[in-house]
Amino acid sequence: MLAVDVEKQLGALKLAVRFDAARGATALFGPSGAGKTSVVNMIAGLLTPDRGSIAIDGTVLFDAARGIDVPPHRRRVGYVFQEGRLFPHLSVRQNLDYGRRMSGRPRESSEFERIVALLDIGHLLDRRPRMLSGGERQRVAVGRALLMGPRLLLLDEPLASLDVAHKREILPYLVRLRDDAGIPMVYVSHTAAEVRRIATTVVRLDAGHMVAAGGLELLDDADIDGLD
């Protein structure tokens, strides 16, 4: 269980968000500028809240009152950014192994093979990122994050830079990840169609505040972009 209760002044925006996220995929949904990326950056330890606390499965990652602020590399949180951020000079195999090495985990061929199969990237292992499609790059980025052995996976608008065809390509893998990986996911998006496909819980944000939390019915009044 992820428990978030944070406040942060970001220029003119006062961010104040409180929510819990259990197994499955929790979507942070709202318009651009609502504070979604700032929230996941605080969970990852890349942005420090002014007040509040963040905990995963009872382990405190941040608590302003108690002076606790666990460094990002010790939080065991996987992060997939909009553009993937693969190393261009490394092969797909080497990019994947980078995630494992950065976490200090031993090499386990069975885990590597399981994640490669889950994301269907075995045929890409010897390629460089420049030889991949946008959807393939994002699948590799997800694989690298999983090989860090995270207890939580953050995905910050991972489809935002992709055209509709590549969004359709990667969406089934994200659904499979949600159902088969056994790792809670926090998925950031302002696109209702994506959230409907992936999320099990929705947290709606607007102007830095949580306005509602619940099921997919919270998307009923949202504009739906066509992905079907």
Q: What is each model feature region?
A:
Residues 61-78, 102:
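ABC ATPase NBD coupling module
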